[in-house]
């Protein structure tokens, strides 16, 4: 039994004639029941052979094979494409957990020439293929292949290939890529919003079922060339506009001190409950220092705020507005209006208490528990986020402090003893006779021995 992504209980013969590739029933018309020749199916155009790995050109603009999902495009240079263990497999209806295994394939897109004559290389785009399908259908899970990143669900058996049929673009659209809650998308990448292909028979069936009058009008429209949009046209136009303005498409916008200050002030002007902390306005500036009443946030998360790559995991636990009001205990408390010199105003606090319950079946449970344990009561740990480094002193203040330290370190001479003070005065006749007697006897009185050399 082969599975078809996007369809419930899909078998090897993936669908009957009245089911679209995305699993939605469509209206059966007369045109769907009649036999169609090659020309009718393609509305007068020549049959386009399905491109495979051997028939597609090497220009870099053709997507290898046909992935069931839209791609993930890189928009920042130097970023690495990777998922955490157990993450990275796109969600699709009808695919059991045992079949959720495969790899992401890097598609190197073509380069183009800017108006000033320079060659610009578009950043790569990644596509997902189930194990045993796609450009590396013969590879085993975990093989070291350039441009391949292996992913699998924790319940999948990676020793066997997936029982997934290949996608036929004429009958199945590419499914917009979605991941399980808690999945962390690689930094510098974004998910394409929808597939690039559409069934060729949809517009034909619609036009043939309108009646003879509209059929003539539609046949005249067939002579007009169909307008096609290349997958990379949007990127090319954006790059050309940026090149005309003298900017590099791959260069991130620089944040100056002035712009960061403006962003920070804009956030702080909002009510406290509407602030969103980020790099320019950290958590402690928005909500104050950590303590018993605000006990969440490690050092890294306090710096980055909601820009922290782990924050989307925590956002899965955040209650909705409805859950906040209807699932919490609320209490309205009136607070003091301030000092006597301030204008009188009524201040209230809407105090709330509640709980968010989850268990080990929640997708990404282990990662969520790890992030919670790292950030809950982190201020109590040694060297926690609440330890603030001292502000650097200004140059003038530092020099004054150094000069004061030098003055403090200078040793001041002690006052002379009474004997030392007496030696400096003139000797009286009595002193001279006493000194002569001492010299004759050869005895030096106590206290005068050390002072005789002064």
UniProtKB/Swiss-Prot annotation:
Stretches the record annotates as Dimerization: 267-383
GO cellular component, one term: host cell Golgi apparatus
Keyword Hydrolase appears in the UniProt entry: no
Superkingdom of origin: Viruses
GO molecular function terms listed in the Swiss-Prot or TrEMBL record: RNA binding
Chain sites annotated for binding RNA: 109, 125, 167
PTM annotation: ADP-ribosylated. The ADP-ribosylation is retained in the virion during infection.
Family recorded in the similarity comment: Belongs to the betacoronavirus nucleocapsid protein family.
Subunit structure: Homooligomer. Both monomeric and oligomeric forms interact with RNA. Interacts with protein M. Interacts with NSP3; this interaction serves to tether the genome to the newly translated replicase-transcriptase complex at a very early stage of infection.
Name of the molecule in the record: Nucleoprotein
Organism field: Murine coronavirus (strain 3)
Lineage of the organism: Viruses, Riboviria, Orthornavirae, Pisuviricota, Pisoniviricetes
């Amino acid at each position: 039994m082969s599975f078809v992504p996007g369809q419930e209980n899909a078998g090897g013969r993936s669908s009957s004639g009245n089911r679209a590739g995305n699993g939605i029933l469509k209206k059966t018309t007369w045109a769907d029941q009649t036999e169609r020749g090659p020309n009718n199916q393609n509305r007068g155009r020549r049959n386009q052979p399905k491109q495979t790995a051997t028939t597609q050109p090497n220009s870099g603009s053709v997507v290898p094979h046909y992935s069931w999902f839209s791609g993930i495009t890189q928009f920042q240079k130097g970023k690495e494409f990777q998922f955490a263990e157990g993450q990275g497999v796109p969600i699709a209806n009808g695919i059991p957990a045992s079949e959720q295994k495969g790899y992401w394939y890097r598609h190197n897109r073509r380069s183009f020439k800017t108006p000033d004559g320079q060659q610009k290389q578009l950043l790569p785009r990644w596509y997902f293929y189930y194990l045993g399908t796609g450009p590396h259908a013969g590879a085993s899970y975990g093989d070291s292949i350039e441009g391949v990143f292996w992913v699998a669900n924790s319940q999948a058996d990676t020793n066997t290939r997936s029982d997934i049929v290949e996608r036929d673009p004429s009958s199945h659209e590419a499914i917009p890529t979605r991941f399980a809650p808690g999945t962390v998308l690689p930094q510098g990448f974004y998910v394409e919003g929808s597939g690039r292909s559409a069934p060729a028979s949809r517009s034909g069936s619609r036009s043939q079922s309108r009646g003879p009058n509209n059929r003539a009008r539609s046949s005249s429209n067939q002579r007009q060339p169909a307008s096609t949009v290349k997958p990379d046209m949007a990127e090319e136009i954006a790059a050309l506009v940026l090149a005309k303005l003298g900017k590099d498409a791959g260069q991130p916008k620089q944040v100056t001190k002035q712009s960061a200050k403006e962003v920070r002030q804009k956030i702080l002007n909002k009510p406290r409950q509407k602030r969103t902390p980020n790099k320019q306005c950290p958590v402690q500036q928005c909500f104050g220092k950590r303590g018993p009443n605000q006990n969440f946030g490690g050092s890294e998360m306090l710096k980055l705020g909601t820009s922290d790559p782990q924050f989307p995991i925590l956002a899965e636990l955040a209650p909705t507005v409805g859950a906040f009001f209807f699932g919490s205990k609320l209490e309205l408390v009136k607070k003091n209006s301030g000092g006597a010199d301030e204008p009188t105003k009524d201040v209230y606090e809407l105090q709330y208490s509640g709980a968010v319950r989850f268990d080990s079946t929640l997708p990404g449970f282990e990662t969520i528990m790890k992030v919670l344990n790292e950030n809950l009561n982190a201020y109590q740990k040694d060297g926690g986020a609440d330890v603030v480094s001292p502000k650097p002193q200004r140059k003038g203040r530092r020099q004054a402090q150094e000069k004061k330290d030098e003055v403090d370190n200078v040793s001041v001479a002690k006052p002379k003893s009474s004997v030392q003070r007496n030696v400096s005065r003139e000797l009286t006749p009595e002193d001279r006779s006493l000194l002569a007697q001492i010299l004759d006897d050869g005895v030096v009185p106590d206290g005068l021995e050390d002072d005789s050399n002064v």
